[in-house]
């Protein structure tokens, strides 16, 4: 639990709140003025395969839900890169509240333009919950950077990730199922071969709306399809796997 004393020490702005991530006491500071994390980020964190010896870079970390959850699950070092200065500040404070500041290196930068300073070939893994919507799909709100390809498209993301990870390193990302072919093409052009896919369905009777993707740098072709991840049953209740990923019934 977080004490009232910590909350009053300028750790929260008037428009911010602390959300419980339901895992090992981890919390996250979020703002009503910025994009808040959703289901996709939590599902992606559960899809990542990493160990405490890995050094992971979180590309476009936002408020840091992926960075915090992945560290909590693997105890690895995470470099979180986010272009939004306010979001970086929240992640710094979230890391402080969680007592994990020494394991999270938070960088305020555009990872697309700063691969040299971030360290080419430095990381064993990269994770990314990228913007899904093209900027030509309609009006863009002031939260556009998190959901629209205003700052980064899948091709530039793939190139940056490939530059930053080692040969044999892995990239984990989620992407809309209807754009899967585009993602595979972009990754292949960046020498990232898709090795594992997991379709995500909202219910058993609906087609996948999302794909969780694992790609490996310099690998040979060959994809393993995991079973569909079903969010809810036909009665609208979370499935056992969703409950496990969200730690609804306790830590696992």
Show where each model-derived region lies.
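Class I SAM-dependent transferase core
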Residues: 9-51
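Conserved beta-strand segments of alpha/beta enzyme cores
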Residues: 27, 77, 103-105, 193-196
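Short loop/edge segments at beta-strand edges and connector loops
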Residues: 30, 108-109, 175, 198
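Residue-level signal for inorganic ion chemistry
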Residues: 44, 129, 157, 215
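Conserved SAM/SAH cofactor-binding pocket of Class I
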Residues: 46-119, 125-139
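Mobile active-site "lid"/loop adjacent to the S-adenosyl-L-methionine
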Residues: 130-156, 160
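Conserved Class I SAM-dependent methyltransferase catalytic core
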Residues: 153-208
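SAM/dcSAM-binding transferase cores
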Residues: 205-252
């Amino acid at each position: 639990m977080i004490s009232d004393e910590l909350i009053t020490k300028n750790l929260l702005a008037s428009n911010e709140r602390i959300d419980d991530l339901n895992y090992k006491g981890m919390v996250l500071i979020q703002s009503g003025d910025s994009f808040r994390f959703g289901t996709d980020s939590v599902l992606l964190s559960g899809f990542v395969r990493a160990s405490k010896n890995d050094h992971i870079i979180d590309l476009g970390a936002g408020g840091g839900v992926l960075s915090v959850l992945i560290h909590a699950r693997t105890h690895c070092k995470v470099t979180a890169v986010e272009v939004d200065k306010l979001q970086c500040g929240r992640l710094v404070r979230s890391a402080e509240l969680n007592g994990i500041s020494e394991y999270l290196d938070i960088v305020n930068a555009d990872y697309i333009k700063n691969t040299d300073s971030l360290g080419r070939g430095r990381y064993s893994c990269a994770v990314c919950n990228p913007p899904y919507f093209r900027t030509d799909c309609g009006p863009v709100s002031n939260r556009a950077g998190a959901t629209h390809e205003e700052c980064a498209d899948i091709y530039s993301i793939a190139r940056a990730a490939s530059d930053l990870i080692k040969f044999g390193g892995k990239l984990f990302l989620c992407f809309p199922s209807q754009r899967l072919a585009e993602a595979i093409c972009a990754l292949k052009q960046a020498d990232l071969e898709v090795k594992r896919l997991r379709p995500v369905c909202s219910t058993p009777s609906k087609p996948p709306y999302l794909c969780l993707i694992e790609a490996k740098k310099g690998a040979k072709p060959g994809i393993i399809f995991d079973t569909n991840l079903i969010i809810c049953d036909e009665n609208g209740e979370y499935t056992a796997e969703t409950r496990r990923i969200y730690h609804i019934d306790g830590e696992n």
